[in-house]
Amino acid sequence: MSILGTIVSFYLGYYVLSRGEKNWIKISFALYCVSGGLFILTRALRIVLTVEQYEIYGATLVYLCGMCGVPVGIALFSRLLTHGEEDTFNTKILSVIVVPPVVCAFIGLVFNPSEVITIEIGHVQVFEPWFQVLYVPILFGWMIYAAGNVGIMMRDLTDDYLRKKMGGIRNGLTGIVVTGFIAYGVATNMGWYNIMFAGDLLVVMFQAYIAYTYLEESV
């Protein structure tokens, strides 16, 4: 299921970029999809890599994609979608949205504050308590920001079609937040593998729903 989720995530990134003219909204969503696909791929890698190899390559994907690419992509997507492109790429916004995940991922790569515990049918990625203080706000905080940002923007919309469209995107983002927290925040550390794998596919379904809703009549 993880391999299927990875393939679909990659395809969604390609699909969004291939429909109509490219813009930074599409690029940021594609970044999120590809990073999410690589993040999901860590489970599949555990099958073919040794523990020593996984501690290097698997953890690297977790840091770079799960703690950097995913939150940056999804936060930029919501910001660009709701505030427009021209006033988004300034020093203030980039420093708030991009720098914290990058710093967090850099800390992970340099200090590698994680331990990989192997169990019969999978793996559990356990972060040291001090690192969770960075990990949880960065990964899930940026997802909550994305859903909340779209929700706040909806209050000022008067066009029914646009409200419906933005509402669908908000619901998709909210679904990703809830599913991600259960599948990656709770199940991963508890060793609930079926929930983890089901969460991979459910997140991809929400990604597809957002892509479809965003691209509807926008090409």
Question: Which positions does each model-derived feature cover?
Answer:
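Individual alpha-helical transmembrane segments in multi-pass integral membrane proteins
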Residues: 1-9, 22-108, 132-141, 192-207
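Alpha-helical transmembrane segments
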Residues: 10-14, 146-149, 208-217
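Juxtamembrane cytosolic interface motif at the C-terminal end of transmembrane helices
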Residues: 15-16, 39, 80, 111, ...
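Juxtamembrane "helix-exit" motif on the non-cytosolic side of transmembrane helices
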Residues: 44-53, 109-120, 181-190
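Juxtamembrane membrane-water interface segments that cap and precede transmembrane helices
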Residues: 117-131
